[in-house]
Structures are given as structure tokens and as C-alpha cells.
């Protein structure tokens, strides 16, 4: 069973995404910011990370860049899930190494299909 780390400073959104992934049969762990996520990834690397951009301490762009520039974690797929929906935001997220970019609000089916596709 695959493990997904959901990183969002909003507990409501974090729990909503986690619930969606749990229903899809995935194991889910959660972090409230980039620093907590980094510590969790170093301790037990997940199979995939879903992260927000705007967070305290370490934003999603910084976390994505760290994941993709660290030899032991660079193969972990990253999905940026953010309310920042401008074309530049999507471009910048992908430039940081994200494997997918989903804009909030999103359709649950889109999140599940993107996660499952990247876990193959």
C-alpha cells in the first residue's frame, strides 16, 4: 500500500484531502508546514507528496525544490495543490520540480486520478 504525505497549513483542507486519499485505499500521513514535512520525509520517505504553496516556515516551492534536489528523495512524485491558479504559478511550480499541479478548488476524481497515475 502506498503512503502519501499531505502538507497544508489548513487543517480543514489537509483533512479533506487525507480523507479522499484514504477512501481511495492509500495510507496517509500529514504535516502542517514545510519544516514538519521535511523532518517526516527524512525519517520515513513517503511514496508521494501533495503540498500547498502558501505555508509558514517553508513554503511549498521551497519544499518541492528540496525534495527534488536531495538524492535520496528526488524520485518521490510531488503534486502541488494550491489556490494560486495563474499560469505563472503553475509554471513556477513545475520549474521547482513538481510532477503535477492541481488548482483548488478541485474535483475529487482529478486528485485521485493524478495520485494514482504518479504512483504507477
Which residues does each PLM region occupy?
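C-terminal output helix
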Residues: 106-115
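Short hydrophobic/Thr-rich beta-strand motif most characteristic of the beta2 strand and flanking loop
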Residues: 25-32, 40
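Charged docking surfaces used in two-component/phosphorelay signaling
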Residues: 15-23
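Receiver (REC) domain active-site loop signature in two-component systems and cognate sites
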Residues: 55
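Active-site beta3 strand of CheY-like receiver
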Residues: 44-50
